[in-house]
Amino acid sequence: VLKQYNPNVRLIYNGFDPELFYPQQIKTSRFIITYTGRLLSLAIRNPELLFAAIARLTEDKVIIPETFRVVWYTDQESRSIIRQEAERHGVQSFMDYHEYVPASDIPLILNKSSVLLSLTNKFDTSGPKGFMTTKFFESLAVEKPILCVQSDEAYLAEAIKETHSGLAATRVDEVYDFLKHYYEEWQEKGYTTSPVNRDKLSNYSRKEQASQFAHIFEEI
């Protein structure tokens, strides 16, 4: 938008520190979907597609609570919203809740996860699209499958598609197939990996961002 007023505007994305966030293959005894952050409004972040897909997977006897968990690291107010929605879809037995953890614990938590959850929603044309938080880029860095529900159909979806890092979903059947695929991979190997395009991924590293800043200053 700013380029309409000044053609010299440059966009440098937020990103991840590759010395802290990098992929590790850690076997786990359970399939774990992890979310870290707040959920203060379903209008901004909505897990409905995830919960509906889990309900279907349960009905089809694909998953059971003993081996399939959704782990939330969030605050009390957010947990209240999540519990209400999970109960409405009949999937509360799959939920685990934790308080926030120190930032130093996050890399290991992400690498022990089977799927990393990014919650968003589609906004109308007059509103903002796609909150691309640091958490999203850190999820990219560990090369675990990212599930974005509901797709913002904008910048988050584009980044996920460009990096081949997961799914920005708009339908329940997409989430169903995505989770079933990675649940079966976890059953076979004990962990999951995402076929990330590392050339595209490197564009979001702090090292690359520093290079972009340096290039801009050289042009001034």
Task: Tell me the role of every PLM-derived stretch.
Residues T170-E174, Q187-E219:
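A charged, aromatic-enriched C-terminal amphipathic alpha-helix characteristic of glycosyltransferases
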Residues G15, K27:
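Carbohydrate-associated surface elements
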Residues V1-N8:
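A short, active-site helix/loop in glycosyltransferases that binds the activated sugar's phosphate group
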Residues L110-K129:
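Acidic donor-binding loop of glycosyltransferase active sites
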Residues V115-S118, E138-Q150:
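Short hydrophobic beta-strand element within catalytic cores of glycosyltransferases
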Residues S41-E59:
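A conserved mid-protein helix/loop that constitutes part of the nucleotide-sugar donor-binding site
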Residues T67-T74, R79-P107:
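Nucleotide-activated donor-binding/catalytic signature segment of Leloir-type glycosyltransferases, i.e.
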